């Protein structure tokens, strides 16, 4: 089910902030494999959707489909199960019991040489 307009705006802004913390670019290319969040880039200042993971800086995925990509790209889950099932996922943003949750995987942050701003440190596990 697609997100409601106000929820979409909030999720877009959060994903925008997370993405810019992970990737220090003004325009971040995103490959989206999550039907619920397909319009996320419409309300973002930095995210631009691309049609192939080989063009992307980051992939947003719900984990329902396997993604074959020739390029090394960051994987960010849009639900908890996808985060747990994908060892490549650097983090996740999802709602649980009506509350937003953010998680980052410490070992993958290190592997990609990513240091998050202090405001995100409490979400690292």
PLM features: residue spans?
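Short hydrophobic alpha-helices and adjacent helix-cap/hinge residues
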Residues: 1-125
């Amino acid at each position: 089910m697609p997100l409601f307009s106000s929820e979409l705006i909030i999720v877009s802004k959060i994903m925008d902030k997370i993405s810019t913390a992970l990737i220090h670019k003004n325009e971040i290319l995103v490959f989206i494999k999550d039907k619920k969040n397909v319009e996320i880039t419409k309300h973002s200042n930095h995210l631009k959707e691309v049609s192939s993971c080989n063009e992307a800086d980051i992939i947003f995925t719900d984990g329902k489909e396997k993604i074959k990509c020739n390029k090394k790209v960051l994987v960010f889950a849009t639900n908890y199960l996808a985060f747990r099932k994908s060892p490549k996922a650097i983090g996740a943003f999802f709602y649980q019991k009506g509350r937003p949750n953010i998680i980052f995987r410490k070992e993958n942050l290190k592997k990609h040489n990513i240091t998050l701003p202090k405001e995100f440190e409490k979400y690292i596990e």
